Structures are given as C-alpha cells and as structure tokens.
C-alpha cells in the first residue's frame, strides 16, 4: 500500500514517532515492511481480524483497536500480546463525529481490569473531551478535524491542554458509579479489609458508610501510614489493628 511509501518519505525528514492503524484480516503480510521502516506503534482493528490472533513478529509497540459497540473484554485473552487499547469513540473513518460518552465508562472499566496497560482514544476529541480524558489518565488521544476548523491550528493545540473549560457533558456522563468505588460498611472495617478495598479498586482511599448507606468518612493511604507510625508498626496488636482504620478516619475528618 502507498502508506508505506508515505512513511518512508516522512522518515527522510522527521523523527516523529509513527502509529500505524491496520484494518485488515491478514496483517502479517505487512510485517516485513513495518519492521524495515521501524514503525514505533502498530494498532490492529479487532472487528476486522476475523479470528486472527497476533502472537509476535513485530518490534513495534502493539495496540488493539475496538469500536464503541465492542466490549473491552475482548482484550482479556490477548493482553499479553498488546501494550495498549485504542478506543474508537466515533464511527471509524468518519471525520468530525461526536464523541460517544459510553466510552467514559469503558475507559474506567479497562483501567481497572488492566492497570498496567495504556488507553488511547481516537474520535470526537476536542478541548472539552481532551480535558476529561486527561483527568481519566488516558495516555494518548488522536485529534483530527478539531485542529482544522473554526480556529487557527496553534490555538486549537493550546485549547487541548487547558485546565479550565466550560463543559457540555454532565458529571454523570463520566463519574464513577457506586459499583466502581471502594466502599466499606460498619461491619467490614478491619485493617486488612481496608487495605484490600484500596488494592481491589486501585485507589488511594476507601469510603466508609453506615447501615443506611450514608457516608461516614474517608480513609486514605496517608491516614493508614500515620496510624502505622503511631502504633510502632501495629505489631502483634490484633484488637487494635481492627479498630485502627476507624481511629485514623476520625482524626482525619476532625483535621479537615
């Protein structure tokens, strides 16, 4: 394909990393040219693979692309062979489409299931969406039509990095649901349970609620560190260990 001639021409005057998105059911026929051109990143479109499974052969970082309708679970069985997931947030090939907000939830779900893998997003990215994606720790966003309409390219690039923006999305479009946050009731507050809750959700805090599902407080990593230091490591104090998180939470809330 002519794209490889274009890449060779770019290589002659630029060291900009290249991400090649292959939409084919037989990507291996291009492997030799990809390796010869030392393309930094290669992304395969899941819906067009038709059962093909990538098992190596390229020196590039590998990504798997999915459309909004495809569940992220398709990444689970092939995660060892890929470095990142590319979420196509609009119809592939459609320039200027609107970002599908269902992808906010998919991003959170993927990052929880695969915390060591990167998330890339392509489609519908403007200044507003870019702001949200950055706060969701998305590694890379592909921006096209937004750069070339309604404003100079330089201004558009700056807008993609601003930290204060008017949003047309509701907080509920991208906020975490109850099932996606660490919560502990009144009967599950041992030190082990608090630590396990933080680890399960890959967050630095756990929320405490009472028997009426009302919030009582928050325990953070900092609270636990302070309590460990206060109690000389909490060694051999099983009863004290069970109460320690509550004490730490109470002190933290009083200080706030």
List the model feature ranges, each with a label.
Residues 1-57:
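N-terminal active-site wall of soluble small-molecule enzyme domains
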Residues 18-22, 40-44, 62-66, 85-87, ...:
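Hydrophobic faces of well-ordered beta-strands that scaffold small-molecule active sites
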Residues 20-27, 65-72, 118-128, 186-188, ...:
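Glycine-rich beta-to-alpha transition loops that act as phosphate-gripper elements at the mouths
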Residues 25-38, 69-81, 123-141:
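Catalytic cores of alpha/beta
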Residues 42-51, 86-98, 136-157:
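Glycine-rich phosphate-binding active-site loops on the catalytic face of alpha/beta enzymes
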Residues 55-57, 134, 148-168:
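C-terminal helical cap(s) of enzyme catalytic domains, especially alpha/beta-barrels
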Residues 65-100:
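Histidine/lysine/aspartate-rich catalytic loop segments that bind and position anionic ligands
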Residues 164-197, 203, 209-210, 215-218, ...:
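Bateman/CBS regulatory modules and CBS-like beta-alpha motifs in cytosolic regions of diverse proteins
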């Amino acid at each position: 394909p002519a794209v490889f001639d274009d890449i060779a021409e770019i290589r002659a005057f630029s060291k900009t990393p290249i991400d090649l998105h292959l939409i084919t059911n037989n990507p291996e026929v291009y492997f030799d040219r990809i390796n010869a051109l030392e393309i930094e990143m290669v992304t395969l479109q899941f819906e067009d693979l038709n059962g093909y499974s990538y098992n190596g052969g390229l020196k590039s970082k590998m990504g798997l692309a999915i459309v909004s309708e495809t569940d992220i679970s398709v990444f689970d069985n092939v995660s060892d062979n890929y470095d990142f997931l590319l979420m196509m947030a609009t119809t592939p090939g459609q320039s200027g489409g609107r970002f599908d907000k269902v992808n906010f939830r998919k991003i959170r779900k993927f990052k929880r299931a695969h915390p060591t893998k990167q998330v890339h997003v392509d489609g519908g990215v403007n200044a507003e969406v870019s702001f949200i994606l950055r706060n969701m720790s998305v590694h890379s966003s592909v921006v096209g039509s937004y750069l070339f309409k309604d404003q100079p390219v330089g201004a558009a690039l700056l807008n993609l990095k601003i930290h204060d923006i008017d949003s047309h999305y509701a907080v509920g479009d991208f906020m975490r649901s109850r099932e996606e946050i660490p919560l502990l009731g009144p009967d599950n507050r041992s030190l082990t349970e608090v630590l396990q809750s933080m680890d399960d959700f890959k967050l630095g805090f756990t929320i405490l609620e009472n028997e009426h599902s009302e919030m009582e407080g928050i325990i953070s990593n900092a609270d636990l560190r302070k309590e460990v230091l206060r109690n000389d490591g909490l060694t051999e104090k099983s009863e004290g260990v069970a109460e320690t998180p509550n004490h730490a939470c109470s002190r933290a809330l009083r200080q706030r």
